[in-house]
Amino acid sequence: MPTNVSGTKDVPIMKCPVCKTPELQMMDVEDGLTFYNCPQCCGNWVKGAEYWKWLEQHGPNLPERSAADSKLLLAEPGFHIDCPECRFRMVKYLVGHGLSFTLDHCEGCKGVWFDRNEWEALKERNLHDDLHSMLTSFWQNAAHKEARKKRLEQIYIARFGPDDFAEIARVRAWLEARANKQHLIAFLTDKDPFDL
């Protein structure tokens, strides 16, 4: 059962950065890793130093699992929130790797806020031990590129329809594998390739 954070003398009272009112409740989620949980929105705060300590004791980095249709309901609020520990405005970081949510990271105290089920979604994919990588520009560039690709794909599906988009994507992949790709494209785009 979670213990009240305000019940300890050396730990300041932390309020939920999303709901603003409930005190965060201390709870162990992994062996050696403590979260501070909001009983109202089910979000979780993990202190940066505690995560790093857990990561060092965790063992080797687990291999990423392939994307699967998760049944977890996520509850990302969509607005910027302030750190429950030091009150800095937190920065949103895209997770990527097939997951479309963001994590809120405090640049001041290095803690991370997980909205409902975000930690669980990371664990399903074995990405929960990669937070340090997610906060790098390399990871973020790849995550933003993935998000742009997904948005453009949705635009093309809306424009062409799902069946036509699937077919043109198949043809495009086929063309990319051909050495004479430019000649094939010229043939396709010529109004009448048989008119000399």
Language-model-detected regions and their locations in the chain:
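Cysteine-rich micro-motifs
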Residues: 32-43, 100-112
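Charged/polar low-complexity intrinsically disordered segments, enriched in acidic residues
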Residues: 137-178
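C-terminal, charged low-complexity interaction regions
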Residues: 173-196
